[in-house]
Each structure stands twice: as structure tokens, then as C-alpha cells.
Amino acid sequence: MSGSTAPRRRTRGTASSAPSPPAGLRLDVRTGDAAHAPVHSVTWRLERLGYGAAQQQVPAGVLKTEGARVELARATPRVTEWFQNSPAGLEHGFTLPERPSANPPGEPLRLVMAVTGDLVPEADATGQSLNLRNAAGRAVMSYAKLKVWDATGAELPATMQSAAGSVTLTVSEATARYPLTIDPVFAQQAYVKASVVPHK
């Protein structure tokens, strides 16, 4: 994809910045080993962050790459979105250095991601994972292993929900000590290429 930067395994190099403000992650998923196997594309973009209905729009980020890790840092609200290859799959995490609001309204924290492309997210009944399904309803890959912890290492209750065109991560963080780390994983049996999507 023009203007994109891919987080790849075993890459080397120093930190770098992108010429265009990046906004999200595109996944190109091949569902078989053959070169002619179907390829699906899905784009994830962190769109809003906040408590209940008091959501802040999330702007494009500043890109930094370091080895197999790619980070998108946003200033307002302060959140760093990051992607890193691991044996479990592609980790898609968020680090919040401080509580988004000095006076949270007593509702859980929500991160809302816009999802577009030819794979549709469908959360399971537990709220701990979701599948990305193709037009035939087949699960092509999963978004799961959601873990959230605070500065003390304490794990926090968290769930994921899906709706038409979006995925929401909900975190109960009223007693948390920041910074906060949110860390789900894209897992698949297929080939996946990840690219950063420029802001439009």
C-alpha cells in the first residue's frame, strides 16, 4: 500500500517517522499457502476514547518503528497504540500514561475502533475474544487474549464488543494506578501482512 509501513518479523533499524500522519492498521490476510489463495483486507483505526458517552475523537498519530515494534503516539488524548509480532500473533496494544479525564464520570473506560474491509468482527458471548469472518461466515482470524494491567501489575477486568463497523474495548479502571496497558492479540493460521494506514 502506498505510503504504508509494515511491522515485520526480525527487522532492524533505528526509530523513524512517516511522511504522512498514520491513523490505523491494515491487515492483509491470505487464507491458504498457495499464491492464488484468497486475500482479505481489514483496516482498524482507533477512533474514540473516553468514559461512557463522553468520548474524545482520536487524531492521527506520530509513527515510530523499532525493530519488530511499531508505535502510533497521540497527544490528545495521550495514548500510544502499538503493534508487535510475537509467537502468539500480532500484538495490538495501547499504553495510556495517565487517566483520560481528571474527573471520570464513574463509567468504564472505552476505546472504540472503526473497522472496515471485507472481514466482519463478531465478538463471542464471553466478551473476551472475537472472530473476523469473511462473506461466507468463516472465521479467518481472531482478536483475543485481552489483558489489561496497571502500574502495579494488577490485572483489570476488560471486555470487547463488536457492532456494525466497530469494535469496543471496555476497561474497569476506577481503582487503577496509571500508566495502563491494554494488550489483545491478532491470532491466525494464515499469512498476515500488517501495514500502517495514513490519515485522510
Language-model segments: what does each one mean?
Residues 1-195:
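Residues that cap or anchor secondary-structure elements
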